[in-house]
Curated annotation (Swiss-Prot):
UniProt similarity note: Belongs to the peptidase S26 family.
Keyword Manganese: no
Taxonomic lineage of the native organism: Bacteria, Bacillati, Bacillota, Bacilli, Bacillales
Stored CDD domains: S26_SPase_I
Protein name: Signal peptidase I
Keyword Protease appears in the UniProt entry: yes
UniProt subcellular location: Cell membrane
Topology with respect to the bilayer: Single-pass type II membrane protein
Superkingdom of the organism of origin: Bacteria
Length: 186
């Protein structure tokens, strides 16, 4: 009977170890291919996203599907553990231009409702929200991104340049922290 108890304890321990290993492997696979939490650092996406907020990034679009204009994307930086959160403005093949505080894609005026709060603040002090630039032709395999806080964002206009598709980690769908600020991101 003692041998039987010893065997049962070994089997029980083996089952626990096996369950823990499976859980760790599943967690790593989910984080690598499905979604991952990211920290928003800085004010370049204000007022849409705020410094210190945490969001989930869906990585599946990187492997299956296409990024869409207006998506909030996470970009892997050149350095390890450096990421940028920006809005995807120009797709491969697009021509992007900003003129008189109005965005044009392929010569057509594009509405940017997510900028309304920042635009009001800029108009109140008599400045443009976004300086004129372009036209910029986005090559195949690249994206043009900008932060929603146009006056304080390093993006495709001024430092990040055009973004390779392989550097886009995924899209943000919602903020999960702080808990009193849980919401979808648009």
């Amino acid at each position: 009977m003692t041998e039987e108890k010893s065997t049962n304890k070994k089997n029980s321990l083996f089952e626990w170890v096996k369950a823990i290993i499976i859980a760790v492997v599943l967690a790593l696979l989910i984080r690598a291919f499905l979604f991952e939490p990211y920290l928003v650092e800085g004010t370049s996406m204000d007022p849409t996203l705020h410094d210190g907020e945490r969001l989930f990034v869906y990585k599946t679009v990187r492997y299956v599907g296409e990024f869409k204009r207006g998506d909030i994307v996470i970009i892997d930086g050149d350095e390890k553990n450096v990421h940028y959160v920006k809005r995807l403005i120009g797709l491969p093949g697009d021509t992007v231009q900003m003129k008189d505080d109005t965005l044009y894609i392929n010569g057509k005026k594009v509405s940017e409702p997510y900028l309304s709060e920042n635009r009001k603040e800029a108009e109140a002090v008599g400045v443009k929200l976004t300086g004129d630039f372009g036209p910029v032709k986005v090559p195949e395999g690249k994206y043009f991104v900008m932060g929603d806080n146009r006056q304080r964002s390093m993006d495709s206009r001024n430092g990040l340049g055009l973004i390779d598709k392989k550097r886009v980690a995924g899209t943000s769908q919602f903020v999960f922290f702080p808990f009193n600020e849980i919401r979808k991101t648009d």
